Amino acid sequence: MKVFLGLLLGYSTILILTYQSPATQWCFYEISLKIPNHHSMECSYPRLYKHFMFMKKWRDKNWSIIIRYYCFYLVFSFAFAGCIAFAICKNLRLCTTMKLLMLLSILVLLSQPILNN
């Protein structure tokens, strides 16, 4: 668990899905934490950006939902990893571990409609 958290904190690049629609191209906006003022944008159909004015355009009405889903899945990935680490530390049986994972999975499925509101 400590190794996983260390790798997560040590990873210096954040990729944010900026915009995705069937009618338009998809783009990833990359921010490097090691190099100050380093920004790059990678698109499915690359085009030249002369200024950083395009950075304002990636906020649309779905951005809050994207952040909610990202945080939700981040929290539940920690919960799944914690469940497996707990099972290993306590020497639980495989049946008990699977029951815990099933309960977490059911909780994830039941909380999906709440995220869409």
Swiss-Prot record:
Residues bearing glycans: N62
Subcellular location: Host membrane
UniProt topology in membrane: Multi-pass membrane protein
Key word Oxidoreductase present: no
Residue ranges crossing the lipid bilayer per the database entry: 3-23, 69-89, 94-114
Alphabetical UniProt keywords: Glycoprotein, Host membrane, Membrane, Transmembrane, Transmembrane helix
Family stated for the protein in its record: Belongs to the asfivirus MGF 110 family.
Protein name (Swiss-Prot/TrEMBL): Protein MGF 110-11L
The species this protein was found in: African swine fever virus (isolate Warthog/Namibia/Wart80/1980)
Lineage per the UniProt record: Viruses, Varidnaviria, Bamfordvirae, Nucleocytoviricota, Pokkesviricetes
